[in-house]
Amino acid sequence: MFLFLCLLFPLGFFIWARSNDDGALRFLPSVFLGVFVSAVFCAFKFFFLPFYYLPQDSFFRNFFHIFCEYVFAPLLAMAILCFLIERREDSFSRFENFFPLCAGFYAIYLPFRILNGRLPIPFFLLFAKPVICFSMILAASKILVALFEKRRTNIMDNSKKIFLSCALAFALLFPAVLEAAWMVGANAVLTVFLTLAYLAFAAGFSVIDK
């Protein structure tokens, strides 16, 4: 039952890497760095911050917690790592390592947070949330790569920059919106439909410029 949760990000990375001209080997150091950072972070939380969040009746409180814990803090850390490790002059974007870093991080972080939470574990957390988080890093990485592509950043027209910026905001905000709505009793069928729609959105952005 837990295999999907534990294997989605590793398998997703290798599928992503096969579509990349450089293959998986070039990005494995970034994956392992993401895994290492995640393991250190999870160990710190386990020993020093053994805190489990109890869903609130307030949509906005739930949204704020989910966004900070699962989106803002992890992705900010991975973005900083991107800028620290991206030194090669021939790299096509400042964020080309963003997806492998995030895949490594969430491969440890998400199972750790979910499996150390409440029991029994709801279907949403075991299946929908991993899909949502994977879709988020897939879409966000592709959009960031396009926004910060070194070859064309200076010639990209403003309308495309605005479109990509809005798409990035949506990609980052929607996961917390959907989970917060689920916490306050959103319709299960609607939740599944929106999860699949978000996956389709991410898949669409994963093939931009191809």
Regions found by a protein language model. Name each.
Residues 1-210:
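Hydrophobic alpha-helical segments at protein termini of multi-pass membrane proteins
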